Regions:
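Acceptor/aglycone-binding surface of glycosyltransferases and processive sugar-polymer synthases
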Residues: 70-84, 101-174
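Short aromatic/hydrophobic "clamp" motif used to bind/position activated sugar donors
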Residues: 90
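Donor nucleotide-sugar binding loop of glycosyltransferases
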Residues: 24-27, 51, 74
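Cell-envelope/extracellular polymer assembly enzymes that use nucleotide-activated donors
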Residues: 14-16, 43
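A conserved acidic beta->alpha catalytic loop
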Residues: 48-56
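Short, Lys/Arg-enriched N-terminal segments with co-localized hydrophobic residues
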Residues: 1-8
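The conserved acidic donor/metal-binding loop of glycosyltransferases
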Residues: 94-99
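Short, well-formed alpha-helical segments that are part of the catalytic scaffolds
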Residues: 23-37
Length: 174
């Protein structure tokens, strides 16, 4: 891994932390604070998607740039974020405090490296995610989808359903 501080660029890379949210009032302030600490040079965007709680207000108070997506659904939010935001590195995370921010610099460094990756995928499954997630059949479904995709595409992705991804500008804008 290339440390973020050693990435060679002609200017400071623009990093955007993108957080799609729907009713994340209870966790969004901590998510914004954690990613602000991990990536102090980043701009943090919270896209509120039809929340009925105070997600937007809490995110704004925590220092995030808040935008809204009126069409309900994560797909609409992600498309709007990718269209609206200009950056060299896009870090997609969820607003429910699922992903540890301490790994964000390493993910971004791979996208901003001299020989960059187009996308780096985070991995929840190597941690305590399955023991904490109590939804019935959720783990089995994730394992089945992961096995099928890895089998079909001859890949070795550990967490195919993760929302923790760093992406290059080239990947996002093409």
């Amino acid at each position: 891994h290339t440390p973020l501080t050693q990435v060679a660029m002609t200017s400071t890379p623009r990093i955007a932390v993108l957080i799609p949210c729907h009713n994340e009032e209870a966790t969004i302030a901590q998510v914004v604070a954690d990613f602000r600490q991990a990536l102090p040079e980043a701009t943090i965007y919270v896209y509120d998607n039809c929340s009925t709680d105070a997600t937007a207000a809490v995110a704004r108070a925590a220092g995030a740039t808040v935008r809204t997506e009126p069409r309900k659904g994560k797909g609409y939010v992600v498309r709007s974020m990718m269209r609206d935001v200009e950056a060299d590195c896009y870090l997609l995370v969820d607003g429910d405090n699922t992903y540890p921010a301490c790994h964000a610099p390493a993910l971004c460094a791979e996208v901003l490296a001299p020989q960059p990756c187009d996308m780096v995928i985070g991995d929840r499954l190597s941690t305590s995610y399955f023991t904490e997630n109590k939804r019935p059949l959720h783990g089995a479904g994730n394992r089945l989808v992961r096995w099928l995709i890895n089998r079909l595409f001859h890949s070795h992705i550990h967490d195919i359903m993760t929302g923790y991804r760093a992406m290059s500008r080239r990947f996002v804008k093409n």
